Amino acid sequence: MSSNYSKTSHTPRRPFEKERIDAELKVVGEFGLKNKNEVWRVQYALAKIRKAARELLVLDEKDPKRIFEGSALLRRLHKLGVMEESKNKLDYILNLKVQDFMERRLQTLVFKNGLAKSIHHARVLIKGRHIRVGKQLVNVPSFLVRVESQKHLGLASTSPLAGGRPGRRARKMAKNNSSKGEEEN
């Protein structure tokens, strides 16, 4: 039995549009992304959220569907920290930008919290399994950190950087040093 996976991103309609390419390159550089596909994935997710908001805005303000689904959508965005709690109207969803989502990525927050020297170092730390969110070890740089989880961001207890077991190279060096010490005796 095969699964039907939905698309996670859309490629641009016009492949060689200078303004778009420059804007994407700026985002890739600023947030230390691997490729443009990461930008397109966020753009697609944002487009789906904005589409849902537009569909709800067309409905009457007293419509139960608009009230229920609108509050659920707003709650989701508030939890992610993409929108401030004070902005609790559907109109504000239409003003969201790709940067708002990029700011909530684990990679960006690791760098901004001072756990990494650069945005690229943050990605290396995450992929190297050195970062945890709460008690959960996370090795996905694009992981969107919730507001309540942000204060629990830190180095994993198993990481050599946090005083865990030394890494492969450190163990090898220690072994070499101990064998040299025995030869001298």
Swiss-Prot record:
Domain S4 RNA-binding residue range list: 104-182
Question: Which Gene3D superfamilies has this protein been placed in?
Answer: RNA-binding S4 domain
> Which InterPro entries does this UniProt record tie to the protein?
Ribosomal_uS4, Ribosomal_uS4_CS, Ribosomal_uS4_euk/arc, Ribosomal_uS4_N, S4_RNA-bd, S4_RNA-bd_sf
Residue ranges, annotated region (Disordered): 155-185
What does the UniProt keyword field contain?
A: Cytoplasm, Nucleus, Ribonucleoprotein, Ribosomal protein, RNA-binding, rRNA-binding
Superkingdom, natural source: Eukaryota
Asked if the Swiss-Prot or TrEMBL record annotates the protein with the keyword Ribonucleoprotein, the reply is yes
UniProt record, GO biological process: ribosomal small subunit biogenesis; translation
Pfam families named in the record:
Ribosomal_S4, S4
Quote the CDD domains the UniProt record gives: S4
Q: Name one GO molecular function term.
A: structural constituent of ribosome
Q: Where in the cell is it found?
A: Cytoplasm; Nucleus, Nucleolus
Instruction: List the record's Gene Ontology CC terms alphabetically.
Output: cytosolic small ribosomal subunit; extracellular matrix; nucleolus; small-subunit processome; vesicle
Matching PROSITE patterns: RIBOSOMAL_S4 (PS00632), S4 (PS50889)
Biological role stated in the UniProt entry:
Component of the small ribosomal subunit. The ribosome is a large ribonucleoprotein complex responsible for the synthesis of proteins in the cell. Part of the small subunit (SSU) processome, first precursor of the small eukaryotic ribosomal subunit. During the assembly of the SSU processome in the nucleolus, many ribosome biogenesis factors, an RNA chaperone and ribosomal proteins associate with the nascent pre-rRNA and work in concert to generate RNA folding, modifications, rearrangements and cleavage as well as targeted degradation of pre-ribosomal RNA by the RNA exosome.
User: Which family does the entry's similarity section mention?
Assistant: Belongs to the universal ribosomal protein uS4 family.
What quaternary arrangement does the UniProt entry report?
Answer: Component of the small ribosomal subunit. Part of the small subunit (SSU) processome, composed of more than 70 proteins and the RNA chaperone small nucleolar RNA (snoRNA) U3.
Name assigned to this protein: Small ribosomal subunit protein uS4
- The source organism is Dictyostelium discoideum (Social amoeba)
